[in-house]
Amino acid sequence: HERLVGSEMCIRDSPGVKALNHAQLKLKPGTVHALMGENGAGKSTLMKCMFGIYHMDEGKVIYEGQEVQIKGPLDALNRGIAMVHQELQPIPERSIGENIYVGRYPTKKYGPVTVIDHDKMYEDAAKVLKEVHLNYDPHAKLGTLSVSQMQLVEIAKAVSADCKVLILDEPTSSLTAAEVEALFTIVDELRAKGVSIVYISHKMDEILRISDEVTIMRDGQYIGTWEAKELTTDMIITKMVGRELSNLYPPRSNTPGAVSYTHLTLPTTSRV
């Protein structure tokens, strides 16, 4: 069965122009589903609909068998849908723990007043950091980390929401080779726990290595879904661009053109 289904999804940029044109995506539990397409194909737009950042003009989202209206990112997180964006939005002057639970701080009663339960927040943050193999102090300022380390904290934030769906938008763009391997370990563990993972990337080696299924989009439209093991790099590129690679890179002709020049020399000048 599918865990999350988006169907006939349309967003109009302007009258007559659709950023999404009857796009669709079906996610199964415990799978890594690659979403591919050229820049501007609509991949991130589709995912931002699933995460409640954008609202559709047409279409529907079915989650756990029920049609839902995702009102915004916090609503998505509360439902168990998490997204790690390509463009990070960290709060560097706040602690790692605060960044993980921003907008979802645990609370406690202090007399008649409800306050943030900092002890529980840092205790829970330490657990989730350990769960994703990050040896960071949750009390440390986020700004002390590198950009790639901040990206891994974003993944910890998604895991902290006990997500059933995790959307990763170009997750390795700023990671080192060692950090990519660490990310893949996390992805494998989440898949084994039944999490549905959307993986957006232009890196073919990553897609073919980690994905179970691949959906390809072009010009805001759904092109098709295939099992990753059925695909090669050339097949993916052909489906992304809509024509054979041989048409993209036709063989060069060595036949001389109508005009050719040989043995040209330039006149010399001498100083007087």
Give the positions of each predicted feature.
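A short beta-turn/loop motif at secondary-structure boundaries
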Residues: 1, 253-256
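Hydrophobic alpha-helical bundles that form the membrane domains of multi-pass transporters
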Residues: 7, 12-249
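Conserved structural motif at the start of ABC-family nucleotide-binding domains
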Residues: 20, 258-261
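Single conserved hydrophobic/aromatic residue that forms the stacking wall/gate
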Residues: 1-6, 11, 263-272
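Electropositive, surface-exposed helix/loop patches at the edges of structured domains
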Residues: 127-128, 256-258
